[in-house]
Amino acid sequence: MEGEEKQQQHKTEDDGIACVAERKVEIKNEKSPGKSTQHPKPCVDRRRVNYAKFIHTNARTYNEPVPYIDNKGPEKQRKWWFHNEAPKHVSQPSYDTKSVQRSDFQKPACPLVLPVKHSRMQKPSCGIVPLTSLDVSGEHENNFVEYISFIHQYDARRTPNEPIKGKKHGTFVQREIKLGAMPIVPKAPEVLLNTLESGSSEQPQKTDKGNSSGDKVTSPGLCQQNSQELLET
């Protein structure tokens, strides 16, 4: 009786699988009517596996049957079934830092003294080229003016078709300032005295030419007194 019931269950499952396959074929034929209809091949009778089943209630794939394997009795199949093994305690030797090789690479307790590769009496260099030191006095003043040159002096008709290196377009050029060409700027009291003296020398010339301004003529002594009062204030 039990064998007959199992056979009936197998038949119903096979009929359900065949119906699903026929429905899929019909849907494909409806989508492509021009193609020839291909009937599914009959299933080969194989040994029935009890733990191979189908899920018929799957909303993700619109209730299509999804095959799955029901793992029954993993305790009996422990030889091939995956299981976690307990970690084994591995004994490690004690770490000894008293050997010669390990003590060389340890951090020393006292501060290290680096060797001096230069004389301490030598002054430090400044700038890219060590030509000047920090203790230079103001005797050697900077008598050069740096500017950008826009002089080409380029002629394509000449055989050396290159401009002068020192006067290329956009290069930095230094021009020496000559001491004789520099204008001497007078101080403030000298400027006032020079202006007052020049005004006093021009006024008597105007009186000689016939200008009737005798009341407004001032002497140079009064001008000097006024300039001294201005400076004192």
From Swiss-Prot:
Protein localization: Cell projection, Cilium
Compositionally biased tracts (Polar residues): 195-233
Keyword Nucleotide-binding part of the UniProt annotation: no
Primary subcellular site in the record, as a coarse category: other
GO CC terms in record: cilium
Basic and acidic residues composition-biased segments: 1-14, 21-33
Ranges for region Disordered: 1-45, 192-233
Keyword annotations from UniProtKB, A to Z: Cell projection
Alphabetized InterPro entries for the sequence: CMIP6
Keyword Iron tagged: no
Annotated region described as Mn, given as residue ranges: 127-159
Coiled coil stretches, renumbered: none
Name assigned to this protein: Ciliary microtubule inner protein 6
Origin organism lineage: Eukaryota, Metazoa, Chordata, Craniata, Vertebrata
Gene giving rise to this polypeptide: Cimip6
